[in-house]
Regions:
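Helix-to-loop junctions at the C-terminal end of transmembrane segments
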Residues: 68-81, 167, 298-311, 393-394
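C-terminal transmembrane helical hairpin of 12-TM major facilitator-type secondary transporters
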Residues: 309-356
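Hydrophobic core of transmembrane alpha-helices in multi-pass small-molecule transporters
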Residues: 27, 106-125, 337-350
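C-terminal ends and interior cores of transmembrane alpha-helices
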Residues: 90-105, 321-333
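Symmetry-related core transmembrane helices of the 12-TM Major Facilitator Superfamily/SLC fold
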Residues: 174-193, 402-418
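Primarily marks hydrophobic transmembrane alpha-helices of the MFS/SLC 12-helix fold
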Residues: 82-85, 315-316
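Short amphipathic helix-loop junctions that connect adjacent transmembrane helices
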Residues: 38-52, 267-283
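Intracellular juxtamembrane helix-capping segments at the cytosolic ends
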Residues: 123-139, 350-365
Length: 433
């Protein structure tokens, strides 16, 4: 059975530390991502590569993330969330420094390997962090996932501000990235040490991690745990049934589009501003900081809106806001207008991942399998997005390539409207802000 659930008399103090721990780790991942994103113009120039080639390099990050996500369920079921998060964040922190070192040696393959390792660490940790967040929501009956992803965005703001400063003084990326890694290492260690041991582990003979029940269900006398003599041979079929569930398909379309919107800004926004507006690297970092700040604001305030209006309704409105933001940045006549438009892009994209995951996880019907499934949909966008936009940008311009993002967001708004009808009387919302 799943182990590691805190006892009732310990729950308040343990949950506070546990919550702080996963927030700290998510913050560290945000700083890592922004540290890379804000220095992409400088890294591109040092490597001497084109937009299409940058897209291929970024595919390393996405491919690593996808491998991490796809392998996370089995790894979590064997080792537990704490160990997976510890390994994942350690790999990502070390790989950030490697990216800077390989940039100095003008090694594009080395940078691609570093990005793949960053993505791998983020991918395996992200699923584990979301499972931790969903479990804390289950225990406290309070919304947490928007705030959890909000701390990622807070990390991107801090990382982006540092990127602005270091870009302004023309600090070489290697020094910037290695300094960030040295600072984030102790913070991440403190974070994962607050996560209880053993949570997420499935004993031999239980349902595989991706098809496991919540801890409460697994502990129940009539829970899904099976004996060693009767292994669950239907687990693959159950996983396929989750992936083909109409509700999961709708959520998958939404998180795919929202992931595309978020990932395209993370990967291409500084370069878009530098190339399309003829702006400096510092200006590109400043616009990206505006995006990151609006993402953080949307996620930190989003729980109240989800509580009031419901998951699917918030997703629909968010998609529409993101459409206007993306189009505004594409057709902005100057950097100031792009900065204003990017705020809509950021707020609109901010709740896509956390609210979609929360929608999938707030169910008694195999929530871990559902969270894993929709997370895979989201990371598919990060896998396909960078090289696709890079290839399109090389031929039709990066701004025109981003019209694909706007089109996907329109599709997400339609899917969220359909999802609203399906969930109106089915999904209980967490209590409290």
């Amino acid at each position: 059975m799943l182990s590691g659930r805190p006892q009732e008399h310990q729950i308040s103090s343990e949950l506070r530390r546990r919550r702080a721990g996963i927030l700290a780790v998510m913050f560290a991942f945000g700083v890592i991502y922004a540290t890379w994103a804000t220095r992409t113009p400088a890294i591109r120039d040092e490597l001497g590569v084109s937009i299409a080639q940058m897209g291929i390099l970024m595919m390393g990050l996405s491919a690593g993330s996808m491998v991490g996500v796809l392998s996370s369920a089995k790894l979590i079921s064997k080792f537990g969330t704490r160990r997976i998060i510890a390994v994942g964040v350690t790999v990502s922190v070390c790989a950030l420094a490697l990216i800077g070192i390989f940039t100095t040696f003008e090694s594009s393959p080395g940078v691609a390997i570093g990005l793949a390792l960053v993505g791998l660490g983020m991918g395996i940790s992200d699923v584990a962090l979301n499972i931790e967040g969903a479990e804390i929501e289950h225990l406290t009956r309070r919304s947490l996932l928007p705030a959890l992803h909000g701390f990622f965005s807070v990390g991107t703001v801090i990382g982006a501000l540092a990127g602005i400063g270091f870009s302004a003084i023309n600090l070489a990326p290697v020094y910037h990235l290695c300094l960030a890694a040295a600072i984030l290492g102790p913070l991440a260690t403190w974070g994962y040490l607050g996560i209880p041991r053993g949570f997420g582990i499935v004993d031999k003979g239980a349902v595989a991690g991706a098809a496991a029940a919540t801890p409460a269900e697994a502990a129940a006398p009539d829970g899904p745990v099976q004996s060693d003599s009767a292994p669950d041979t239907s687990a693959p079929a159950k996983q396929r049934s989750v992936l083909l569930d109409p509700t999961i398909l709708l959520i998958g379309v939404i998180i795919l589009a929202m992931g595309f919107a978020e990932g395209s800004a993370d990967d291409w926004l500084p370069l878009l501003i530098v190339d399309s507006q003829g702006a400096s690297e510092m200006a590109g970092s400043l616009v990206y900081t505006g995006f990151a700040a609006s993402m953080a604001l949307g996620r930190l305030a989003g729980g109240a809106f989800v509580q009031r209006f419901g998951h699917a309704q918030v997703l629909a409105v968010s998609a529409v806001m993101a459409v206007f933001g993306v189009l505004g940045v594409i057709y902005a006549p100057n950097v100031a207008v792009a900065m204003a438009a990017v705020l809509f892009w950021g707020v609109g994209s901010s709740l896509g991942f956390p609210v979609a995951i929360s929608t999938a996880g707030n169910t008694s019907d195999r929530p871990i399998a559902r969270v894993s499934a929709v997370t895979t949909w989201g990371y598919a966008a990060f896998l396909v997005g960078p090289p696709l936009l890079g290839f399109m940008g090389e031929h039709i311009g990066l701004g025109n390539a981003l019209l694909l993002v706007a089109a996907l967001l329109v599709l997400a708004a339609v899917a969220a409207t359909v999802l609203t009808r399906r969930l109106r009387s089915q999904l209980p919302l967490p209590e409290g802000p």
